[in-house]
Amino acid sequence: MRKVKPARKLGRTAAHRKATLSSLSTQLILHKRIETTEAKAKETRKVVEKIITKARKGTVHAQREIFKDIRDKEAIKTLFEEIVGKVGTRNGGYTRVIKLCPRFGDAAKMAVIELVDFAEAPAAAPKAARQDRSKRVKGSRKTEASAAKAAPAAQAAPELPAESDAPAAEAAPTEE
């Protein structure tokens, strides 16, 4: 009896799906964080988890097995030198999938997939911006707008007398 395998087809043929997942895995290893659709991120997570587990063995055989999936020497070098060194004691769970808002063009569910030990804290910068906005005093927009209008007027005012002096100086020496 036919049984269904629990995997996403991603709307591709088997060869195209394998190539897509290979490419996404390579980019994840090189960049440590990529943004893609949610389905591709979840499938990439499966592939990358297995690759990193093989890489932790550190043998030549493991390198050759991984090269079947990745096919990029720079990515394999990064995997064995940087990533395995950081995740050496971790037993699985090397990646994280974070869901994002839908893509603007086609409303596809988007996600970020990243290596856990290489995650940076991008949330620190937006919090600082929010604090600056919340400290704004009522009516300060009007004062900022009037100050912005006054500043260009103040800068433009000194230029006008300088230009008016030059034509007068040129007009005076003409005698016939």
Curated annotation (Swiss-Prot):
InterPro entries per record: Ribosomal_bL17 (IPR000456), Ribosomal_bL17_CS (IPR047859), Ribosomal_bL17_sf (IPR036373)
Annotated GO MF terms: structural constituent of ribosome
Q: Where is this region: Disordered?
A: 124-176
UniProt lists compositionally biased (Low complexity) regions at 145-176
A single Gene Ontology CC term: cytosolic large ribosomal subunit
Q: Which UniProt keywords apply?
A: Ribonucleoprotein, Ribosomal protein
Name the UniProt record assigns to this protein:
Large ribosomal subunit protein bL17
Q: Which organism is it from?
A: Chlorobium phaeovibrioides (strain DSM 265 / 1930) (Prosthecochloris vibrioformis (strain DSM 265))
